[in-house]
């Protein structure tokens, strides 16, 4: 006769595995533990640097801020790297820094506030931004001399709150943002009805067509995008949308989550601005509908680069 053995008691290592795993220290690769030398040894060489960043950043400020990071892990060295790489003299004033997320502007306020003041002048941190997108308030600008004005363009960047900005966002964030943008842009109608072109799936024929229309250029990736990290995983989740008239264009996941542009030949800047105001409102309205039915937070007017 076979006798059944009593069931073995579960080993304690298995029984309490889930508790032990919670008590284990975090893997070194997961925690933010930057191995750095002293501030003097890590401070960049700014002797001939002409950027605004170089005029603001001091060794004392670097000592105070270099160990800080936003919750997503963006550091002061990440912020200043584009300016460190862009050290040669330029006739154009270059800011020389980027923000990795909205929190960058508060965590590194000691750096950003004087930098914004240097670039824009009369900047006051406690002053609220007031937007005036009523084209009726624009006086004149309907017939600028076309001997001097070939093209008029109005452009702005928009980012979705709680997503990292392009210098720091992950592949998953970028893909979620592209999906959000496509849903909103494809819902536009009237003069804003148009087509989204994914750069990843762009055929040679489509590339030539968009280049001929002035929407694409040969050098889509700028030095700033390379040094800041904006070009990571290019062209994954990047694309451009344009209306049928090709005078209202939206870039997705380039320098900002969205870069919205109204453009046309000639000197009627008021017409361009009117289209920009109306189109921007429509895009944001459609985005808010997508946000309402999805899990996306609200839009912000902060941008990744000043």
Predicted stretch roles:
Residues 2-305:
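Long, Pro/Ser/Thr-rich low-complexity/intrinsically disordered regulatory tracts in eukaryotic proteins
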């Amino acid at each position: 006769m076979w006798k059944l053995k009593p069931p073995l008691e579960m080993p304690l290592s298995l029984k309490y595995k889930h508790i032990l795993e919670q008590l284990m220290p975090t893997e070194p690769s997961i925690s933010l533990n930057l191995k750095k030398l002293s501030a003097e040894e890590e401070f960049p060489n700014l002797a001939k640097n002409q950027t605004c960043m170089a005029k603001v950043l001091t060794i004392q400020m670097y000592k105070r801020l270099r160990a800080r990071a936003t919750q997503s892990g963006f550091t002061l060295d990440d912020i200043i790297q584009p300016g460190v790489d862009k050290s040669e003299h330029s006739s154009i004033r270059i800011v020389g820094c980027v923000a990795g997320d909205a929190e960058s502007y508060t965590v590194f306020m000691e750096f950003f506030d004087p930098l914004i003041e240097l670039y824009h002048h009369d900047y006051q941190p406690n002053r609220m931004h007031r937007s005036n997108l009523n084209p009726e308030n624009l006086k004149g600008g309907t017939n600028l001399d076309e001997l001097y004005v070939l093209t008029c363009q109005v452009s702005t960047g928009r980012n979705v709150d709680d997503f990292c900005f392009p210098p720091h966002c992950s592949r998953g964030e970028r893909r979620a943002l592209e999906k959000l943008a496509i849903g909103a842009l494809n819902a536009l109608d009237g003069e804003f009805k148009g087509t989204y072109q994914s750069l990843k799936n762009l055929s040679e024929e489509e590339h030539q067509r968009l280049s001929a229309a002035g929407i694409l250029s040969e050098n889509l990736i700028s030095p700033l995008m390379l040094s800041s990290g904006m070009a990571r995983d290019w062209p994954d989740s990047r694309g451009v949308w344009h209306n049928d008239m090709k005078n209202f264009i939206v870039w997705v996941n380039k320098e900002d989550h969205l870069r919205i542009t109204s453009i046309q030949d000639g000197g009627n800047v008021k017409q361009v601005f009117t289209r920009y105001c109306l189109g921007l409102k429509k895009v944001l309205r459609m985005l808010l509908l997508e946000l309402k039915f999805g899990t996306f937070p609200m839009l912000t007017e902060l941008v990744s680069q000043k």
